């Protein structure tokens, strides 16, 4: 397994997503990180935003993320081996007032990533500006 220090954004997101899923928590990547992944970093984001579709307590998520050396400070989780910051915005998974219906599944060497579609990613970024 690749060390966190050597993971790109997609690999790190898949690693976190899989670690959470192995603990019964299904999270979907949303926000700017999706655009970074779909655009091959032509748009760069250092926030890894997951929506927790399992409605798990923040305390439980924090405990699970501690297992992979992520510590919580305010609403963010960080790991000294990476510049990416992880956050869990409140759900439900939606773009504006519309529910997200299409979730993509991307297999990487570090795990499985559940991510909103390219179209919903664009709509999400566009909605964030208005």
Locate the predicted segments by residue.
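Compositionally biased terminal segments of proteins
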Residues: 1-130
């Amino acid at each position: 397994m690749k060390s966190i220090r050597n993971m790109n954004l997609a690999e790190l997101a898949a690693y976190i997503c899989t670690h959470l899923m192995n603990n019964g928590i299904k999270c979907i990547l949303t926000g700017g990180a999706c655009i970074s992944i779909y655009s091959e970093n032509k748009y760069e984001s250092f926030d890894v935003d997951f929506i927790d579709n399992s409605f798990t307590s923040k305390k439980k998520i924090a405990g699970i993320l501690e297992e992979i050396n992520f510590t919580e400070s305010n609403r963010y989780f960080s790991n000294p081996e990476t510049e990416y910051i992880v956050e869990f915005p409140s759900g439900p998974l939606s773009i504006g007032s519309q529910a997200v219906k299409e979730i993509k599944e991307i297999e990487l060497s570090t795990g499985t990533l559940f991510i909103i579609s390219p179209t919903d990613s664009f709509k999400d970024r566009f909605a964030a500006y208005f």
